[in-house]
Amino acid sequence: MDQFPIMGVPDGGDTAWMLVSSALVLLMTPGLAFFYGGMVRSKSVLNMIMMSISAMGVVTVLWALYGYSIAFGDDVGNIAGNPSQYWGLKGLIGVNAVAADPSTQTAAVNIPLAGTLPATVFVAFQLMFAIITVALISGAVADRLKFGAWLLFAGLWATFVYFPVAHWVFAFDGFAAEHGGWIANKLHAIDFAGGTAVHINAGVAALMLAIVLGKRRGWPATLFRPHNLPFVMLGAALLWFGWYGFNAGSATTANGVAGATFVTTTIATAAAMLGWLLTERVRDGKATTLGAASGIVAGLVAITPSCSSVNVLGALAVGVSAGVLCALAVGLKFKLGFDDSLDVVGVHLVGGLVGTLLVGLLAAPEAPAINGVAGVSKGLFYGGGFAQLERQALGACSVLVYSGIITLILALILKFTIGLRLDAEQESTGIDEAEHAESGYDFAVASGSVLPPRVTVEDSRNGIQERIGQKVEAEPK
């Protein structure tokens, strides 16, 4: 049996790529904050941003204490990793200098590794996934969830839902631990970068939390329009940029797999944006800025699990399917009566399901996740039968059911103990004022565009003199 973590010398190129990828994935959370912040009303923008940013604090602390160990420790009962194995990241941070290499007379330095990477780099990379998964949920509960309840929910959900599910999906045998999770190693469902662990997981959690919390006051009779579409588009652009670290970085090496996933991610995202806009045009007669931004995110979500298993045509199919289906799915909340404020269910749950299941149809024999890989099959459209589709469906359903049940339990516990929701007066005032005693747009009152009723030539001359430090003398009467 190998001793974990394995000690060795990391690959410099892989390490550099993964450090950049980790930073790119972290950038996605501020991008999400802008994306969500622009979609709410002006009196909720700060709270929406705060929910994303605060997830960075809560999840990071828990990840360092026990989260990484639950996600990537040795498997315990097919449920989670050993929480004590890497408690406080023990055994992962440190340098062991050994005797000089006789051939070069230079000191070789062994450090804990995850594959070819320093273990600390892999810890950081996976932390960023945990952060944004929690932050995604916040979009479903805009305008009405107490901030303190959100912080507590974020910690509990990360502990009991995300960390175990990440173990199922991302903990491959012999990488960070000897025995990893069952979806990755026994079921052999393909989820390259988190269609199940991130998007289906967060999407169904958002649905459960929104149902327990209840509808916004006045919804759906009152339409809650985005207050800042430039914020929304800026957020979508940052998400697209950061997603290259998310998908291509999941190769964990600077190689052709990273390159292939970079390309398929780009193609699918572009196709999804066009698919969403076309759907809007046919259905509503207009193609909107919000639709373009939402289509971008839908494409990124759908290609996440499939980016290493499809070719160019497959990426186009994934993107178009996600753009059209997610554009249609966001209307389900009006028919079914649940208030998913910012369409987390329609984009992330539906998009994650689309991308995960399409692997079973479109997995190409030449793709990196299929070619020469044991335990997986080509997609149905390439003559592989239903085997891979069945694996994909079982993996997706397992995450959906587990996350849905545990999230429902956590939400109900919080509702009947500390309470989840603002009161009616606070909701009417606005959650920014009620929870943070701030407003995102206070500066507008003192805008430079507010001028005196009459400005004379003398006023202008005196103003210029004051700016350059000259004494202002009164004009003789």
Swiss-Prot record:
It comes from the Bacteria. One of its GO terms (molecular function) is ammonium channel activity. It is found in: Cell membrane. The keyword Transmembrane helix applies. Involved in the uptake of ammonium/ammonia (NH(4)(+)/NH(3)). Belongs to the ammonia transporter channel (TC 1.A.11.2) family. This is Ammonium transporter.
